[in-house]
Amino acid sequence: MTELTQVLQLQSMSATHVIESGNQRVVLLIVAHADDVALFLGGTVAAWAASGWRVVVVRVTDDRWDSVGLSEADTIIANAAEFRRAADILGVAEIVELGYPTDTLADVSEVALREQFIRQIRLHRPYALVTFDPYAMYGEDNQDHIKVAAAADEAFWTSQFDKHHPEHLAEGLKVHGCFERWYFGRKVVDVTDVVDISDTLDRKIEAACQHTTMMTNFANQLCLQASTGGWDLPLAASVVATGDIRPMMEALVAASSAATGAAHGLGAAEEFRVVTFGGLAGYLEHLGVRRP
């Protein structure tokens, strides 16, 4: 076996990832819904922003149905406003709204959605592309997450092809290759990188607490399920009755972050599958020359 083959065949192991200085390099985060950022990776987003990374978030849907007791129009307005507040807390530099109706992406052409993502990659020219892990969908019942994951994963490599959407080039955009891909999910498979969010957990919790509309609906769902099973859920019932989501969100976010951290000997953490240089980082390290 050659040395290069040995390098390429090294099995990945999870390691604590220290966020380096961004120097205004771009992280492009593509999510389906407003609450995805805070709940899945709010601590890491806050760490990126604090370290000088420019974080751009693309929200694909308008979350028009994610509420309880509000009209569709009021739901769109409320969720957008709460998303902006949460993003400000985390240090997000820019939000891009694609405005697709929520919970309907299963009927949207994946190729059409991919084109939207390619455009954003070529426009913002990110160092890292961040989205749902298409290979960590076991137990995932949200088709919006699944469709975004698949389209974004393909957009990573098709954004580098000048034959894919030459109309972008005619508009002055250029093909672009992201150096890293960061994948997250409900349960990440083959975790490679763990980010210690002990210093940014408070901001993650505070950002999550901005999503009153969506989390009240979530609490209502929990109460409905519990009732069917013959249970009461006082914390969730209190949210439905009062609209105060903070006690529930503080408990849930702190507990989940601590559980992830405990698995890696940390106080609080978030897990990712990170792919560098298209999965050929060993090749790059063996034959490449780093620029000064």
Spans of model-derived segments:
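Active-site rim/loop-helix segments in enzyme catalytic domains that contact anionic ligands
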Residues: 1-124, 281-290
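Internal alpha/beta domain cores that form substrate/cofactor-binding pockets in large enzymes
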Residues: 56, 84-184
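C-terminal accessory domains and tails appended to enzymatic cores
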Residues: 2-23, 161-174, 186-292
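Histidine-centered active-site/metal-ligand motif
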Residues: 33, 141-145, 211
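Hydrophobic/aromatic ligand-binding patch that stacks against planar heteroaromatic rings
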Residues: 47, 151, 155, 207
